[in-house]
Amino acid sequence: MMQIQNILRAGHVPRWQLCDTTRTQSIAEHMFNVALIARHMCAHIGINGDEMNEIVVQALTHDMDEVILGDMPTVTKQRLREAGIEPNGLIDCVETIITDPFAKQLVKIADLIEAAWWIDEHGIGRHAERVAEITRHRLFSMLNNAKVDKALTSAGMDAWERIKHGELLI
């Protein structure tokens, strides 16, 4: 289990270290945004009560490993996976490891929506544009994947469209 001091550091651990941005985003801000998107997706699908709360908590803690390890670029995570290492499991510090496949997909879609939106809004320069393009491609590839539940595809597309048009998700 992670110590409270490390959890509280999440607000000071930066993301997007390899991209120029108009401002710094912390791991805590990212996880909070992902939780709001996940909550919206749950409501869109009709998930509520304890199940929604569990998914929101999972979204609030999904990148807690990065408080210790720092933000890892996707390419690094891919290379670790190729080596048989799950990057989000490098530090077994969070009790809310996502085991339910549906919840895992929902949080991943919310994570990609948040990342694509944030780098679109705050990225500067050609590299940030490329990262935004890659992130959007990953998002839409996942949403169009036949293995992804159609309710998740619908909820993800709704959340993406609302965010792009500046609508509140709450």
Swiss-Prot record:
The protein's matches in Pfam families, at most eight in alphabetical order, are given as: YfbR-like
- The intrachain disulfides are none
Cofactor binding mode and count = Uses a typical 2 metal-ion mechanism to dephosphorylate dATP.
Q: Fetch the InterPro entries from UniProt.
A: HD/PDEase_dom
Q: Among its keywords, does the record have Hydrolase?
A: yes
User: Which reactions appear under catalytic activity for this entry?
Assistant: dATP + H2O = 2'-deoxyadenosine + triphosphate + H(+); dADP + H2O = 2'-deoxyadenosine + diphosphate; dAMP + H2O = 2'-deoxyadenosine + phosphate
Task: Report residues binding Co(2+) 2.
Answer: 66, 71
Briefly, what is this protein's role? Catalyzes the hydrolysis of dATP, dADP and dAMP into dA. This step is essential for Z-genome synthesis (containing aminoadenine instead of adenine). Specifically removes dATP and its precursor dADP from the nucleotide pool of the host, preventing the incorporation of A into the phage genome and favoring the integration of the Z-base into the viral genome.
Family membership noted in the UniProt record: Belongs to the Caudovirales dATP triphosphohydrolase family.
Protein name listed in UniProt = dATP triphosphohydrolase
Specify the taxonomic lineage. Answer: Viruses, Duplodnaviria, Heunggongvirae, Uroviricota, Caudoviricetes
In the UniProt record, the gene name given for this protein reads datZ
